[in-house]
UniProtKB/Swiss-Prot annotation:
Lineage of source species: Archaea, Methanobacteriati, Methanobacteriota, Stenosarchaea group, Methanomicrobia
Pfam families: Ribosomal_S4, S4
Tagged with keyword Ribonucleoprotein: yes
rRNA processing recorded as keyword: no
GO cellular component annotations of the record: small ribosomal subunit
Name of the protein in question: Small ribosomal subunit protein uS4
Family assignment from sequence similarity: Belongs to the universal ribosomal protein uS4 family.
GO terms for MF: rRNA binding; structural constituent of ribosome
Role of this protein: One of the primary rRNA binding proteins, it binds directly to 16S rRNA where it nucleates assembly of the body of the 30S subunit.
SMART domains recorded: Ribosomal_S4, S4
Organism: Methanothrix thermoacetophila (strain DSM 6194 / JCM 14653 / NBRC 101360 / PT)
Record-level GO BP terms: ribosomal small subunit biogenesis; translation
Boundaries of every S4 RNA-binding domain copy: 106-168
InterPro entries per UniProt: Ribosomal_uS4, Ribosomal_uS4_arc, Ribosomal_uS4_CS, Ribosomal_uS4_euk/arc, Ribosomal_uS4_N, S4_RNA-bd, S4_RNA-bd_sf
Quaternary assembly: Part of the 30S ribosomal subunit. Contacts protein S5. The interaction surface between S4 and S5 is involved in control of translational fidelity.
Length: 183
């Protein structure tokens, strides 16, 4: 056992480091979602792996007829649906069918780009790390922050940021059109 106050790795490296198909898939995901390195992708895979493992254990518990299985399954499904990873009313089989893109779509970096607050996925990352983005009134500077479904509509430019002004040249043309300003 280790010291509980010490930070530990939140990801596992691939067992076969030079597998060509996996490497090509990773590069494509990194380009699509604007990740800086494969470690960020491996962290998302670890999150997915954890929930799929829990889903398998809960399915086995239900098959054995354990009483707590239904309560624990409802809690896990509720948590994943709060983050927008699962749809409302999903079941345990839906957890097993999750893909890595379901996790990556919930990152703040992806949400900022999809909502049109940035012109590119890389610009979205820059806006976040420079403190130009807020979620529910709080400045967030972590691109990998997983956005809850309820907070999705509260993503906006930070009030103290120069980007909050309508005429700022770096503002996305989509957001200017959405707010009624002139582009």
């Amino acid at each position: 056992m280790g010291y509980p106050g010490k930070s530990h790795k939140t990801y596992d490296r691939p067992r076969k480091p030079w597998e060509a198909d996996r490497m090509a898939n990773e590069v494509e995901l990194i380009k699509t979602y604007g990740l800086r390195n494969k470690r960020e992708l491996w962290k998302a895979e670890s999150i997915l792996r954890k929930y799929r493992r829990v889903g398998r254990m809960l399915l086995a518990s239900k098959a054995r007829g354990e009483a707590r299985a239904d309560i624990e399954a409802a809690a896990v499904i509720n948590r994943l649906s709060r983050f927008g990873i699962l749809k409302d009313g999903a079941d345990l089989d839906a957890i097993l069918s999750l893909k890595i893109t379901d996790i990556l779509e919930r990152r703040l970096q992806t949400q900022v780009y999809r909502q049109g607050l940035a012109n590119t996925i890389r610009q979205a990352r820059q806006f976040i790390t420079h403190g130009h983005i807020q979620v529910a009134g709080q400045r967030v500077t972590v691109p990998s922050y997983l956005v809850k479904r309820g907070d999705e509509m509260t993503i906006d430019y930070y009030a103290g940021s120069p980007l909050a002004r309508e005429g700022h040249p770096e503002r996305s043309s989509k957001i200017v059109a959405r707010t009624g300003g002139s582009a």
